[in-house]
Design a protein with these regions (language model features):
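Acidic/His metal-coordination segments adjacent to aromatic residues that form catalytic metal sites
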Residues: 68-72, 97-98
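Membrane-helix boundary connector in multi-pass membrane proteins
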Residues: 94-104
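N-terminal intrinsically disordered, cationic/polar leader segments
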Residues: 1-38, 45-46, 51-57, 64, ...
């Protein structure tokens, strides 16, 4: 699996990403996108439009990485996740353009991401050791 392309300034986080197993990378990406969306909401309330937009752009990049990490041969779950990520990207894009309902849209996306993160964490904790490539493919991750 390719490493996330999100810029990382923090040395600890950079090391964590470089040494993470594929399942851990997914969790790191979920944590990052949730953080970016929460920061966007705070900055929206503070009327810092530029910071709001930057955090939404970062969140979109992470969600696109999550899409790219899917093994589309693992049907139907990979296709369903792809569609869900696509929906999230549209909602974030709408929030960037339509100020009226952006708070509700972003909160809905955050809840979905939190649910997905919880699910992936459960999978990580119950999945067999990640040495076998076939095991990873079954978990919808591409190498």
């Amino acid at each position: 699996m390719e490493r996330p392309k999100v810029p990382v300034d923090d040395r600890y986080l950079r090391m964590k990403i470089q040494t993470a197993k594929p399942m851990e990378l997914i969790l790191i990406m979920y944590d990052g996108v949730i953080l970016f969306l929460k920061r966007a909401l705070v900055n929206y309330e503070l009327r810092k439009r530029h910071v709001f937009d930057e955090n939404l752009k970062k969140s979109k990049r992470v969600i696109k990485e999550l899409q790219l990490s899917l093994n589309m041969d693992a049907k139907p779950i990979a296709g369903q996740l792809y569609s869900l990520y696509d929906y999230m990207l549209r909602e974030i894009g709408d929030a960037m353009c339509n100020r009226k309902e952006n708070r509700a849209k972003l909160q809905r996306v955050i809840r979905m991401l939190q649910d997905l993160r919880t699910t992936w964490d459960k999978i990580k904790n119950t999945a067999p050791v990640e040495k076998d490539k076939r095991t990873l493919e079954k978990l919808t991750l591409s190498m």
